[in-house]
A protein has these predicted regions:
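Non-globular, low-confidence helical/coil segments that flank catalytic cores
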Residues: 2-257
Length: 257
């Protein structure tokens, strides 16, 4: 996981405490995370170290949202973090940003271990083992997959969770990624999954507010994402890149950094 700060600073009246556990941890297997907490009981975002993948947990006013869960090998880590670190057994919302193994592979374990209220995905059918495994886990719990539309939103306590993308039909599965903006007071987080430039350009043309205090950088810091025009609209104070140490893809790419 990489952490980077850019020019604009957050509203520290909202961000009262920030814990950052950065750098890649060794093979001991501990979950490195960054927890952003506002107020004593209000809002926190946890970026779980799932290596070359994405996994985040958002908690607000006793409500819990999981955004991606890393690969299947990281499912137990996500569950352990939920149950042992956060003491959560009920997950109100799960978002699988897109049907790739490094994003949804660990979600079946979350669905099996926790009582999940709602599951979001950009598709409800997809011919690939990670998605089929997630769907079976959901079916076993009588949990329906909901395919949201851009512009729809839901409340997570006092936080608002809004879907901004996908806005079109794309050949590249990465561009199908559900892009989510979470706002709590004056603080905003933008989660982009693996959305690449075509999706980013559609978002910048949409007129929607893309600004964010914290950007979860798209596609693990690949140069296929985080275009200049997109970054100029988001203007984050901080950026989180989730990727594995010495990964085969060379993420994060130098030009993104």
């Amino acid at each position: 996981m990489k952490f980077k700060q850019h020019g604009k600073r957050p509203d520290w009246r909202a961000l009262l405490a920030v814990w950052l556990t950065l750098a890649f941890l060794t093979a001991a297997g501990f979950a490195a995370y960054s927890a952003w907490q506002t107020s004593r009981i209000g809002f926190a975002v946890h970026f779980v170290d799932v290596g070359q993948g994405d996994g985040a947990i958002v908690v607000c006013d006793g409500k819990t949202l999981v955004i991606d869960g890393g690969t299947a090998e990281n499912g137990a880590k996500m569950v352990e973090y939920l149950q042992n670190t956060l003491h959560v057994s009920r997950v109100d919302f799960v978002i699988g940003t897109h049907p790739h193994a490094d994003h949804i592979g660990g979600l079946p374990d979350v669905i099996r271990a926790c009582k999940v209220k709602k599951l979001y995905s950009p598709v409800d059918e997809f011919e690939a083992k990670p998605f089929e495994t997630m769907k079976r886990a959901a079916d076993d719990k009588k949990l329906k997959i909901t395919v949201p539309q851009a512009g729809q939103s839901f409340s997570l306590g006092r936080a608002k969770v809004e879907f901004l993308a996908p806005l079109g039909i794309y050949d590249n599965v990465n561009d199908l990624s559900l892009v989510v903006r979470i706002t709590y007071g004056q603080t905003a987080f933008l989660f982009t999954g693996d959305a690449e430039r075509p999706s980013e350009y559609d978002m910048t043309d949409s007129g929607e507010d893309l600004s964010a205090t914290v950007l979860k950088v798209g596609h693990h810091g690949s140069n296929t994402s985080t275009s200049y025009v997109f970054l100029r609209q988001v203007m984050p104070a901080y950026a989180i890149i989730s990727c594995g140490k010495d990964n085969a893809y060379g993420h994060p790419h130098e030009e993104v950094l």
